């Protein structure tokens, strides 16, 4: 990072810089992290980094205000989804302003929020008193909330953890009290190859995979029809779907291998472990015995691809009321997408989700955020500072 070049100071200018870093989850985010680290250092703020095992990606954490005191954490992820194959009308990594909007990959999800936080740093430094503000920016949220786990593990070793966390995912600045959790699995079915004229001598991996997929489909229908239901969510029940299948080499060859990926998006109150146990029990007790009657070497293997918990809003009533007061929106919402909030909540750090922009613009070509949304988030930061700077500030 060239620290001889003046850093931008406005939200829009900072966002332009953040967008210029291609932080697709498959790439390193270190250039962006080093830029944030240098930006904070220029303002006298010390950062700490936690890296992935390869040292190619990092989270950044910083505290503005007194050390060793629990404060409000402002959290977001630095990675973005790919642009490959999407029909963008301009360079996705160059911020373009048009019709009261700024376009670029990550504008809504969620570098707009990070830009608002960074633009507010000088004001935070001037105004914070007894209660600090913490900044937490992670890597690889888009591929299963991977990076934040290392950040939280580091926080768990500290004498004091944050009082609460605001996750800045796009909610149009409404306060979201909860969201569903998710688990994604890859299932590998290993059969026995052979000539298709002699099907009785082989074990058709695709057909047995279909038995498992049908079981998942039936379970999904049961959840839809019998619940449990929570009308705060859309849809109001936990869902199961198979999203990818591959297997076989030719129509006249008994397929030796088939693999498929499925996911469960579950209500925060649902027991997802029990759901997974049902599927694995069906594989173990019904599918594998049929396969192994022909060849004992056949079998079914489950591999978890990604997982994050739902956000229940446990212990967050004070935080919810406080943030609703800051936004001016008294009606809280729930989210159909996931965030890192449930992982903070699992550490007994109350969490809500509130940030600028709309999830409807995320992951799409010509992703954008309205300038009015950035202005609302800027105002939120100032109001947050005013509130926490008051003597004796408490959330409850």
What are these regions (language model features)?
Residues 2-85, 257-261, 278:
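N-terminal helical capping/dimerization or prosegment-like subdomains
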Residues 48, 73, 134-136, 301:
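A structural signal for isolated positions on well-ordered beta-strands in alpha/beta enzyme cores
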Residues 53, 186-396:
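Metal-dependent amide/peptide-bond hydrolase catalytic core
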Residues 55, 78-79, 101, 136-145, ...:
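Acidic, glycine-rich active-site loops and adjacent beta-strand->loop/helix elements
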Residues 71-134:
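Active-site metal-coordination/substrate-binding segment of hydrolases
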Residues 83-98, 162, 177-189:
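Acidic-glycine-rich active-site phosphate/pyrophosphate-binding loop
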Residues 98-100, 120-135, 159-161, 216-226, ...:
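Phosphate-handling active-site elements
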Residues 110-184, 395-396:
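Acidic/histidine-rich catalytic neighborhood of metal-dependent amide-processing enzymes
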């Amino acid at each position: 990072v060239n620290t001889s070049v003046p850093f931008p100071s406005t939200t829009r200018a900072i966002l332009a810089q953040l967008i210029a870093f291609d932080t697709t989850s498959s790439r390193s985010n270190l250039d962006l992290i080093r830029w944030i680290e240098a930006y904070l250092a220029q303002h006298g703020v010390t950062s700490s980094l936690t890296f992935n095992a390869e040292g190619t990606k990092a989270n950044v954490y910083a505290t503005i205000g007194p050390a060793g005191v629990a404060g409000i954490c402002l959290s977001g992820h630095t990675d973005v989804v790919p642009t490959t194959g999407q029909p963008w009308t301009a360079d996705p990594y160059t911020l373009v302003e048009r019709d009261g909007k700024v376009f670029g990959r990550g504008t809504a999800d969620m570098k707009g929020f990070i830009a608002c936080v960074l633009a507010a740093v000088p004001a935070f430094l001037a105004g914070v008193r007894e209660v600090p503000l913490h900044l937490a920016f992670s890597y690889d949220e888009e591929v299963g909330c991977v990076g934040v786990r290392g950040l939280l593990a580091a926080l768990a070793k500290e004498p004091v953890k944050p009082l609460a966390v605001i996750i800045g995912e796009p909610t149009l600045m409404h306060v979201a009290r909860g969201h569903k959790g998710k688990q994604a699995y890859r299932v590998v079915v290993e059969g026995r190859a052979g000539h298709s004229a002699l099907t009785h001598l082989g074990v058709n991996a695709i057909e047995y995979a279909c038995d498992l997929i049908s079981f998942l489909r039936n379970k999904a229908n049961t959840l839809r029809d019998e619940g449990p239901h929570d009308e705060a969510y859309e849809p109001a029940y936990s869902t199961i779907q198979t999203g990818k299948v591959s297997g076989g080499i030719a129509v006249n060859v008994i397929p030796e291998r088939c693999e498929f990926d499925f996911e469960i998006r579950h209500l925060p109150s649902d027991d997802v472990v029990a759901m997974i146990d049902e599927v694995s029990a069906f594989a173990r007790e019904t599918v594998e015995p049929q396969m192994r009657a022909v060849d004992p070497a056949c079998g079914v293997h489950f591999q978890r691809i990604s997982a994050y918990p739902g956000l229940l809003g446990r212990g967050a009533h004070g935080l919810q009321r406080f943030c609703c007061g800051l936004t001016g929106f008294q009606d809280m919402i729930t989210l159909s997408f996931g965030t890192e909030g449930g992982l903070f909540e699992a550490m007994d750090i109350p969490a809500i989700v509130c940030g600028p922009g709309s999830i409807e613009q995320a992951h799409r070509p010509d992703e954008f955020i309205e300038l009015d949304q950035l202005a609302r988030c800027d105002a939120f930061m100032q109001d947050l500072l005013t509130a926490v700077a008051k003597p004796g500030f408490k959330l409850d």
